[in-house]
Each structure stands twice: as C-alpha cells, then as structure tokens.
Amino acid sequence: MTEQNTLEANKGLMRRWFEEVWNQGRVEAIHEMMSEDCINHGLSEDPGQPLRGASGFLPFHTQFREAFPNIEVVVEDVIAEGDKVVARCSVRGKHEGDSLGMKATHAMVDFDGIAIARVKAGMFVESWNSFDFARMYKQLAV
C-alpha cells in the first residue's frame, strides 16, 4: 500500500469510527477498529488514567450512548499525516437517558471536539481526545 493509500485508509477508519461506533451505536465496531492494547487519553474521569483497549473504552461508550441514545457526530474535517489521523467533530444530541451520574434532562446539547489517533495495521492503537464536555454539562444545567 502506498503512503497516500495508507493516509486515505486512516481517514476512512476515522470517519467509519464516528459513523458506526457513535452515530449507529455498533458496539462490535469498537472491537473491529480498536486494538485491545489501545491507550485512550482524555476520556476518563481521572485525566491521568487513560482508558485501555476496547474493553476499557466500552463502559464510557455505553454510558454516553445511554445518556444520548440518538447522538449525532458530524465529522467536519479529517487530516492524516504519518501514522496519525485527526478529526474535528460537531456533536449534537438530546439527553434522554439516566446515565453519566444524572437523571435525563431532555435538554438538547451541542459541542465540539477533536480526536487524534495513531493507527497501526488498520486499527487504533492510541488516541488523544479533547471534547468540550464542560459546554455539554453547562447545557444540561449541571
């Protein structure tokens, strides 16, 4: 595979991640795209403790999808360089589930985020995530 083909494949993997894992809620897609050795930074309640592997990521995903069952993530931009791929996203959803430590507020939220991932052999092996969860919680009046 040429370098250009690898970059395009990595961009496709990132787009597929947000479409299948978040928009469609396909849990099995997590295991298809994320290495069990993957280190996920920026998603844990304890910033110093990354979520490890698909099994470590799954509780975060489950809680978030329970709170926002119809979440919509729009990938605005995707950039790839070397073994890394970056996505700039807009997130929208209605807080309809009792999860994330609170009762459903039925409030609409919208916030933005950036995800950077390192890809090896077509799988995510490390990610750095910066989503504006403070804005999300403010919209939930928490």
Give, region by region, the residue ranges found by the protein language model.
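C-terminal and inter-domain tail/linker signature
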Residues: 1-142
